[in-house]
Design a protein with these regions (language model features):
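Structured, hydrophobic secondary-structure cores that serve as assembly/anchoring elements
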Residues: 1-103
Length: 103
């Protein structure tokens, strides 16, 4: 089972790392740099027995996402039978709540 503290610490670390990419263009290099920036932290979790997968590529950053000035980053964390998904979306400045709500 994944403890709430592990999830909260991971979310906090993601926030810190992602903040360095706020004004970067969503391209292959930026997505790779983001993934690589997370590796040291995620490696520690792997050493503790967690399975980790990062997704930040063209599969979740389509042309539409890029055209909307967004960047999607997802971390899957698994231990035993417990699997969690942490979604991070960087959006353009000035976005309204109405734009974020599903139609």
């Amino acid at each position: 089972m994944i403890s709430q503290k592990v999830i909260e610490d991971l979310e906090t670390h993601i926030e810190q790392v992602v903040s360095h990419f706020w004004f970067e263009v969503n391209n292959q290099q930026t997505r790779e740099d983001l993934r690589v920036s997370m590796v040291p932290y995620l490696s520690n979790l792997i050493e503790e027995g967690y399975e980790i997968e990062q997704v930040c590529d063209e599969s979740n950053n389509s042309h539409e996402v890029i055209d909307n000035n967004e960047l999607y980053y997802v971390v899957y964390i698994k231990k035993d039978d417990d699997l969690r998904q942490i979604n991070t979306v960087m959006r353009k400045t000035g976005v309204s709540f109405q734009e974020l709500r599903p139609a």
